[in-house]
């Protein structure tokens, strides 16, 4: 996936900054027993975020949002991500290709860079859900250390919780 397709990369200077950053990737794939339309209805609703996020995160949407996402939608969240410290996260739905994929990108938040693509692919038995995340930590080598010690495992835990929740509702073995 080329970086230049991300909305946050506006010119060659931005692209060069991305190249110098330590970019981390997290990829998840899950098979679910529901139709493409049912999957889109669930994942495109900002109100389902609480169901698929661990309770320790205390996520709440603090901006007024519609029932379904669309390209350009700004979502403002409050969460307690690290040591129970409240933080605000503003993200934008930068791409929306109903009912197959959407991308949200951090505009204000704890990361130097964050892009999360959610892809839904119809199969004979349901759908394949794919999450493709790229992120970079702020504050140079210290951010890289914090990622190694704390953040990477927290992100894994978030997506493990989501996987377990979705499996309990619509789990399907490949």
Where are these regions (language model features)?
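Beta-strand elements of well-folded, non-transmembrane domains
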Residues: 32-34, 79-83, 95, 110, ...
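Hydrophobic ligand-binding cavity/cleft-lining segments
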Residues: 15-70
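Short, surface-exposed coil-to-beta transition loops
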Residues: 25-27, 86-90, 112-116
């Amino acid at each position: 996936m080329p970086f230049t397709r991300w909305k946050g990369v506006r010119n060659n200077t931005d692209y060069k900054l991305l190249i110098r950053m330590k970019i981390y990737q997290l990829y998840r794939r899950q098979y679910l027993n529901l139709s493409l339309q049912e999957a889109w209805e669930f994942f495109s609703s900002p109100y389902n975020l609480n169901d698929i996020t661990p309770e320790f995160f205390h996520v709440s949407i603090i901006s007024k949002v519609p029932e379904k996402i669309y390209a350009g939608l700004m979502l403002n969240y409050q969460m307690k991500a690290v040591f129970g410290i409240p933080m605000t996260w503003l993200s934008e739905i930068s791409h929306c290709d109903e009912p197959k994929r959407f991308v949200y990108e951090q505009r204000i938040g704890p990361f130097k860079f964050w892009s999360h693509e959610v892809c839904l692919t119809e199969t004979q038995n349901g759908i394949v859900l794919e999450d493709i995340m790229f992120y970079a930590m702020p504050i140079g080598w210290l951010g890289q250390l914090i990622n190694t010690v704390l953040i990477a495992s927290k992100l894994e835990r978030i997506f493990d919780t989501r996987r377990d929740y979705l499996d309990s509702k619509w789990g399907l073995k490949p």
